[in-house]
Amino acid sequence: MAGQAFRKFLPLFDRVLVERSAAETVTKGGIMLPEKSQGKVLQATVVAVGSGSKGKGGEIQPVSVKVGDKVLLPEYGGTKVVLDDKDYFLFRDGDILGKYVD
């Protein structure tokens, strides 16, 4: 179902489409957190990437992340995109702060 949405939407150039991770709604002690108390989610999973941007010499600079990577996002920014009633966000490759490695 969600995979079909990505076949219909492909980011261009150095854009990266991500799905934010779900916010923690329950603490380790079992206390339910109200929505206002939940922190802003800065971690996401890459679901689609563009082909890259042109460098100064005209060559294509590939995007630095790939589908499936877990990345750290800036607190603000990104463009909200709704696909199959789910929220995703588009960021430029250079705006992504880093990626988590195993």
Curated annotation (Swiss-Prot):
One of its GO terms (biological process) is osteoblast differentiation. It is found in: Mitochondrion matrix. The keyword Transmembrane helix does not apply. One of its GO terms (molecular function) is ATP binding. The modification Phosphothreonine is found at T79. The modification N6-succinyllysine is found at K28, K40, K54, K56, K66, K70, K80, K86. Induction: By stress. The modification N6-malonyllysine is found at K40, K54, K56. The modification N6-acetyllysine is found at K8, K40, K56, K66, K70, K80, K86, K99. The modification N-acetylalanine is found at A2. It comes from the Eukaryota. Keywords: Acetylation, Chaperone, Mitochondrion, Phosphoprotein, Stress response. Coiled coil: none annotated. One of its GO terms (cellular component) is mitochondrion. Its main location: mitochondrion. Belongs to the GroES chaperonin family. Homoheptamer arranged in a ring structure. 2 heptameric Hsp10 rings interact with a Hsp60 tetradecamer in the structure of a back-to-back double heptameric ring to form the symmetrical football complex. HAMAP family: CH10. Co-chaperonin implicated in mitochondrial protein import and macromolecular assembly. Together with Hsp60, facilitates the correct folding of imported proteins. May also prevent misfolding and promote the refolding and proper assembly of unfolded polypeptides generated under stress conditions in the mitochondrial matrix. The functional units of these chaperonins consist of heptameric rings of the large subunit Hsp60, which function as a back-to-back double ring. This is 10 kDa heat shock protein, mitochondrial. It comes from Homo sapiens (Human).
